[in-house]
C-alpha cells in the first residue's frame, strides 16, 4: 500500500515508512523500551522531513515531548503540468463559447482561467519579486477550497444554462417549423395559381371561340341573304331581259293557223269600217311594241348589274365578319398564353420564396444542432473539471487523514 498526494506530488510507500521507523529504532537498540518517547519523536521528525514539513521543537510542559507542525506541501512538477493542461483546456473551451451563451457561464470560465494556473506559472512577490499575473487576485490550484467552490459555481451556472439552451433550441425549432409551414403554404399557393390560370385561360378561350363562331355565322348569314335578295332577282331579271330580246328579234311570236281569219275589221267612231290585214307568219312586230321593249332593256340591264354589285358587297361584308371571328379566336388564344405566362411568373416567385423558407428551415436546424453541440461540450468540460476537483480534494483529504493517522500512531 502507498499513500499518494496528487496536488503535491508526494508518494510514500510502506517500505519508506518502515525505513523511517526502523531508523529511529536501530539507534536506540536495547534502550527502545526505556526511551519510547524520544524514538517516536525522531521518527515523526524524519517523516516530516520527507513529506516537506517544518519541525518546530516545542517542549510540552507536562510530557516533555516535541510537537510537529506540518508546512504547506509544495506541488511537484507533474502536478504543475496537469494544472497547465487543465488551464489550457479551459481557455480553449472559453474561446469556443459563443456570444449568445449565458453571461454567468462565460464570466465563470473567464474567472477560472484568470485565477487557476499552475503554481509554477505565477510567481508571488516572495519568489523573485515578481507580481502576480492578473492583478492582486491570488492564484490557487483545484485542491484549494476556493477553487472547488468556483467549480461548483460553474456547475450551477452550467445547469442554469441548460434551461437557456432548451429555450433557444425551442425557438430555433419553432422557427424551423414556421419555415416548413411557410414552404407548405407556398406549395398550396402554387397549386392555386395553376388552377386559377387554367380556369381563367379556359374561360377566356371559350368566350373568344364563341365570339369568333358568332361572327363567322354572321358572315355566312350575310352570304345567304345576298343570294336570296340579290342573286335570285338578278336571275329573274336576266331571264326576262333575254325573253324581251327574243321578242324584239321576232322570235317566239304567235303565228296564225290556216283556218283563222287573215284580216280584222275595225269600226271607227265615225261609223267608218277599216280593215287591217294580219301577218300570218308572225315575223313582224309593231313599231310601238318594239319601241317600248327597246326603252326598257337598259333599265333592266342596270338592275341586273346593281344586283350583282350588291351581292359582291355582301360577300365582302361576310368576309369581314368571318375575319373578325378568326381574330377573336386568335385573340383568345393569345390571352390564354398571357395568362399562362403571368401564372408561370407568379409560380416562379412562389417557388423562390419556398426555397428561401426551406433554406431558413435548414439554417435554423443547423443552428439548433450547433448550439446543442456547443452546450453539450461546455457541460462535459465543466463536469470533467468538477469531477477532477472533487477527485483531487478527495485524494488530498485521504492523504491528510492517512498522514494524521500515521502521526498519531
Swiss-Prot record:
Q: Which UniProt keywords apply?
A: Secreted, Virulence
Where does the record say this protein resides? Answer: Secreted
- Region (Disordered) location: 268-287, 330-396
InterPro entries cross-referenced by the UniProt entry: BipC/SctB (IPR005427)
- Check the record and name the Pfam families matching this protein: IpaC_SipC
- Biased-composition ranges for Low complexity? 360-369
Extract the signal peptide range.
none
Please provide, in alphabetical order, the Gene Ontology terms of the cellular component aspect for this entry: extracellular region
Q: Where is the composition biased (Basic and acidic residues)?
A: 370-382
Which family does the record claim for this protein? Belongs to the SctB/SipC family.
Q: What is this protein called?
A: Effector protein BipC
Which species expresses this protein natively?
A: Burkholderia thailandensis (strain ATCC 700388 / DSM 13276 / CCUG 48851 / CIP 106301 / E264)
**Lineage from the top down?**
Bacteria, Pseudomonadati, Pseudomonadota, Betaproteobacteria, Burkholderiales
Amino acid at each position: 500500500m502507498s499513500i499518494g498526494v496528487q496536488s503535491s506530488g508526494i508518494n510514500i510507500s510502506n517500505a519508506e515508512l518502515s525505513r523511517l521507523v526502523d531508523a529511529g529504532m536501530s539507534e536506540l537498540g536495547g534502550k527502545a523500551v526505556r526511551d519510547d518517547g524520544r524514538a517516536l519523536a525522531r521518527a515523526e521528525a524524519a517523516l516530516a522531513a520527507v513529506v516537506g514539513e517544518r519541525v518546530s521543537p516545542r517542549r510540552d510542559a507536562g510530557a516533555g515531548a516535541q510537537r510537529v507542525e506540518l508546512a504547506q506541501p509544495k506541488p511537484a512538477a507533474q502536478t504543475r503540468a496537469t494544472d497547465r493542461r487543465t488551464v489550457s483546456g479551459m481557455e480553449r473551451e472559453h474561446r469556443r463559447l459563443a456570444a449568445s451563451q449565458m453571461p454567468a457561464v462565460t464570466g465563470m470560465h473567464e474567472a477560472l482561467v484568470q485565477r487557476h494556473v499552475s503554481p509554477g506559472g505565477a510567481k508571488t512577490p516572495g519568489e523573485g519579486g515578481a507580481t502576480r499575473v492578473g492583478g492582486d487576485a491570488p492564484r490557487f490550484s483545484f485542491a484549494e477550497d476556493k477553487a472547488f467552490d468556483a467549480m461548483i459555481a460553474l456547475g450551477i451556472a452550467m445547469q442554469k444554462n441548460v434551461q437557456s439552451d432548451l429555450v433557444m433550441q425551442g425557438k430555433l425549432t419553432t422557427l424551423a417549423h414556421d419555415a416548413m409551414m411557410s414552404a407548405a403554404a407556398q406549395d398550396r399557393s402554387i397549386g392555386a395559381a395553376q388552377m386559377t390560370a387554367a380556369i381563367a385561360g379556359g374561360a377566356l378561350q371559350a368566350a373568344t371561340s364563341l365570339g369568333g363562331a358568332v361572327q363567322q355565322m354572321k358572315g355566312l348569314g350575310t352570304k345567304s341573304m345576298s343570294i336570296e335578295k340579290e342573286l335570285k332577282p338578278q336571275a329573274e331579271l336576266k331571264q326576262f331581259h333575254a325573253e324581251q330580246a327574243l321578242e324584239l328579234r321576232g322570235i317566239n311570236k304567235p303565228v296564225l293557223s290556216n283556218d283563222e281569219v287573215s284580216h280584222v275589221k275595225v269600226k271607227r267612231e265615225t261609223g267608218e269600217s277599216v280593215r287591217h290585214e294580219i301577218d300570218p307568219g308572225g315575223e313582224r312586230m309593231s313599231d310601238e311594241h318594239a319601241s317600248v321593249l327597246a326603252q326598257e332593256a337598259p333599265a333592266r340591264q342596270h338592275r341586273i348589274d346593281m344586283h350583282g354589285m350588291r351581292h359582291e358587297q355582301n360577300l365582302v361584308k361576310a368576309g369581314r365578319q368571318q375575319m373578325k371571328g378568326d381574330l377573336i379566336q386568335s385573340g383568345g388564344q393569345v390571352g390564354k398564353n398571357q395568362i399562362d405566362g403571368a401564372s408561370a411568373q407568379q409560380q416562379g416567385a412562389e417557388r423562390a420564396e419556398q426555397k428561401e423558407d426551406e433554406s431558413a428551415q435548414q439554417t435554423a436546424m443547423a443552428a439548433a444542432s450547433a448550439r446543442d453541440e456547443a452546450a453539450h461540450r461546455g457541460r462535459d468540460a465543466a463536469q470533467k473539471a468538477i469531477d477532477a476537483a472533487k477527485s483531487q480534494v478527495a485524494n488530498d483529504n485521504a492523504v491528510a487523514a492517512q498522514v494524521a493517522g500515521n502521526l498519531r500512531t
